[in-house]
């Protein structure tokens, strides 16, 4: 397509040249100039066709626009001066083509400026730079200054030839891309050097696998010591709370399960089954047990006061003579001595029969008579005694045997035995 457009343009210029040759006389050397003009026009047309193609114009309109630009002698340096009115005068009426051409004109102008700047800067450094650096004396500095002044001025940037403009633009674009890549790589390297080194990733036990632990075999003194410590630690078993508090006794575990009688609760010594059966028979046969010799007159003189606390008895006597109550209380206090004298053993070992006394075969229906130790008082007094324990709780059970009750009703075992000893 491009070749066809070029051939068309060449044919047009050829016909115009033929007409001129017919009308005007041929001048010497005119054919050479015409040929050069044709070549330059063809190259200019090809450049403008390429320009319009890069701007996005279709090939047909691009050829027409290129011919119009060549006919109106539009140069590349005039691209920034183009506007909508000028484009309409040049025959470009399509609005989209106008906008595309104006945008691409700005881009091409920028590329030409970059190319001119790169060509103006020398590629290799001047050979006198090393000598200037090495020159330390005044003479060497004068020589270098004179050489700098005498050096020819730098040539102005020459307009590139139209034949090599496309190649130069492509090379400048490639150089700019390479320089941009180099700067990006340098910036990336600097960032990597300044960046903090990444922390090492932690390897978990699942990723690494199972550990193999080699236990000491006891070949060295240190390993033997470690094994001894482990054995000692294994020997110390952990004890429970019950082991640390002590084992429970059999009596503690069986106390609540077995029924206990009144005699076991009073602290009596365990007796045989025959004695217990005989005691129960005596209790059932006699409703009232009489105390033998409780109020008898003691043959011995008054003994010294017992170290244990005496039993305080509150007596209520119904009699016409009130002076006979005091001797009776004295005899009751003295009668407790007989119970204390026959206590050689501990109270827990005294049988129930001994503590109760011998049972009378025939219960007396009449009240007992109280006789005073004094010879002056011979009157009979009927005494009703009400015992009340006021002493300490730990008093002996034998102290409650010093009085005889005067009612003929049934007396329970607890009343006959007295309070429980602790």
UniProtKB/Swiss-Prot annotation:
Q: Give the region (Disordered) as residue ranges.
A: 144-166, 251-285, 299-324
Low complexity composition bias: residue spans: 310-324
List, alphabetically, the SUPFAM superfamilies matched: SAM/Pointed domain (SSF47769)
One short Pfam family name for this protein? DUF5577
Task: Note the superkingdom of the native organism.
Answer: Eukaryota
- The reply on keyword Zinc-finger is no
What Gene3D superfamilies is this protein classified in? Answer: Transcription Factor, Ets-1 (1.10.150.50)
Report where the covalent cross-link Glycyl lysine isopeptide (Lys-Gly) (interchain with G-Cter in SUMO2) sits: 250
Q: Which InterPro entries match?
A: C19orf47-like, C19orf47_SAM, DUF5577, SAM/pointed_sf
Q: Name one GO cellular component term.
A: nucleus
Instruction: Cite the PANTHER family for this sequence.
Output: DUF5577 DOMAIN-CONTAINING PROTEIN
> Under which name does UniProt file this protein?
Uncharacterized protein C19orf47
* Organism in which the protein naturally occurs: Homo sapiens
This protein's gene is called C19orf47
């Amino acid at each position: 397509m491009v070749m066809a457009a070029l051939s068309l343009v060449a044919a047009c210029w050829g016909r115009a040249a033929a007409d001129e040759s017919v009308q005007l006389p041929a001048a010497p050397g005119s054919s050479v100039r015409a040929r050069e003009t044709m070549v330059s026009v063809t190259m200019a047309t090809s450049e403008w066709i390429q320009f319009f193609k890069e701007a996005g114009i279709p090939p047909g309109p691009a050829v027409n626009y290129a011919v119009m630009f060549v006919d109106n002698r539009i140069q590349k340096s005039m691209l920034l001066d183009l506007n909508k009115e000028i484009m309409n005068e040049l025959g470009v009426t399509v609005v989209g083509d106008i906008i595309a051409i104006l945008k691409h004109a700005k881009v091409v102008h920028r590329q030409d400026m970059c190319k001119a700047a790169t060509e103006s800067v020398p590629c290799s450094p001047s050979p006198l730079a090393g000598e200037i650096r090495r020159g330390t004396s005044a003479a060497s500095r004068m020589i270098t200054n004179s050489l700098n002044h005498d050096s020819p001025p730098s040539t102005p940037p020459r307009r590139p030839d139209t034949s090599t403009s496309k190649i130069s633009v492509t090379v400048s674009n490639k150089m700019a891309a390479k320089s941009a890549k180099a700067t990006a790589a340098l910036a990336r390297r600097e960032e990597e050097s300044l960046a903090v080194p990444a922390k090492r990733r932690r390897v978990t036990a699942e990723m690494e696998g199972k550990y193999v632990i080699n236990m000491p075999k006891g070949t060295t003194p240190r390993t033997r010591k470690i094994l001894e410590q482990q054995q000692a630690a294994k020997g110390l078993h952990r004890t429970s709370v019950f082991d640390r508090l002590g084992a429970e006794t059999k009596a503690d575990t069986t106390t609540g399960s077995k029924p206990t009688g009144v005699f076991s609760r009073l602290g009596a010594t365990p007796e045989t089954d025959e004695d217990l059966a005989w005691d129960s028979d005596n209790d059932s046969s006699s409703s009232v047990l009489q105390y033998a010799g409780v109020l008898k007159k003691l043959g011995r003189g008054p003994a010294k006061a017992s170290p244990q606390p005496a039993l305080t008895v509150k007596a209520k006597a119904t009699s016409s003579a009130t002076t006979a109550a005091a001797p009776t209380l004295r005899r009751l206090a003295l009668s407790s001595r007989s119970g204390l004298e026959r206590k050689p053993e501990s109270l827990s070992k005294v049988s129930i029969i001994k503590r109760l006394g011998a049972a009378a075969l025939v219960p007396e229906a009449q009240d007992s008579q109280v006789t005073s130790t004094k010879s002056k008082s011979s009157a009979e007094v009927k005494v009703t005694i009400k015992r009340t324990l006021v002493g300490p709780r730990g008093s002996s059970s034998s102290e409650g045997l010093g009085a005889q009750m005067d009612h003929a009703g049934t007396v329970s075992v607890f009343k006959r035995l007295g309070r429980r000893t602790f």
